[in-house]
Amino acid sequence: LLEQRKAAIDPLKALLYLALATMLGVPTGAMAEPTAPRILNVGYYEFAPAIYTDAHGTARGELAELTRRVARQAGYGVRFRALPSARLYGALEKGSIDLWPGAQGKPELAAHTLEGQHMLSQINLNLYHRAGTPAPRIPEDLAGKSLILIGGYSYWPNINALLDDPGLDLRVLRTSNHLSALEMLRRNRGDYLLDYQIPVEQARQRLQMEELPYQRLTQVPIHFIVSRHARGAEAIVTGLDAAYETLRDAGEDLSLPSD
C-alpha cells in the first residue's frame, strides 16, 4: 500500500517541480544537450589566396576564416562548397547555397539575393600587359588583339560589353589558372591579360616574374551575399551584420587584404 501511494505521489511532485522551475525561470531542459547550430551552406569559387580549397578539401584563406568567425558569432555553423561561378550563381538563385562571401552588385543576382551592409574587402579587375609595351587606349587599342582570361569567371556588364563588341574583333584565350595565364602573357601567347590583382600578385611571386604594368578597369567590393531563397534569409543577413559589428566593436581585427 505504501509503495502504491509513493507511485501516485511522485508524478504529482514532478508536476509541482516543473511548475516551480517555470515560475523561477530555471531552464527545464538543463539536463538536455544544447541544440546544434544551424549550418549555412557557403558557396565560393577558387580565388587564392583569399579563399581556396586545400589539399584536404577544406576551404582556406583569410576570407574563409572571416566567414567562419562571423557566422560563429551569429550562431551559425558553416559548410563550404567550391563551385564554378555559373553554378554558384545558379545555386544562389535556387537557394541550395545560403551564403556567398563575394562581389556586391552582380546584376544577375539582384532579384535573388540580399547583401550585407559591411564591405569585407575590395579587389581590382585589371588589364595587364608586358613590361616595355605601351599602355593600351581602351577600347580602341584592343581591336584585333588577343586577350587572356581565366575560365569560369564572370564579369560586370561594362566588361562583358567590351569582350562581346564585334567591332573590336578580340581573340579571347581562356586558361584554367593564374599561373598559366601569366606564362601565356610572358611567352607572347596573348597581348593582354584580364585578371584580378590579388591572385595575379600571388602567381607572379611564385613565378618570380617582374611586376607587370596594368590599367584598373573595375574595383569590386566584397560583401556577404545571402540567397533570398534561403530559409530565414533576412534573419541571416541581419545576424551576420550584427555579428560583424560585435566583433569589430570588441576590437577584433577583421581586416582582409585589399588591392
Predicted segments with their positions:
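Periplasmic-binding protein-like
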Residues: Y44-F47, Q122-N126, R206-Y244
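Short helices/loops that flank or line small-molecule/ion binding pockets
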Residues: A86-D98, N177-L194, I198, R206
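Ligand-binding cleft/hinge of the Venus flytrap
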Residues: T67-A74, H118, A143, Y155-T175, ...
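Extended ligand-binding regions for polar small-molecule ligands
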Residues: G61-Q73, T133-A135, E140-Y153, V226-D259
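Short loop->beta-strand "edge-of-pocket" segments that line small-molecule binding or catalytic clefts
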Residues: R38-Y52, P139-Y155
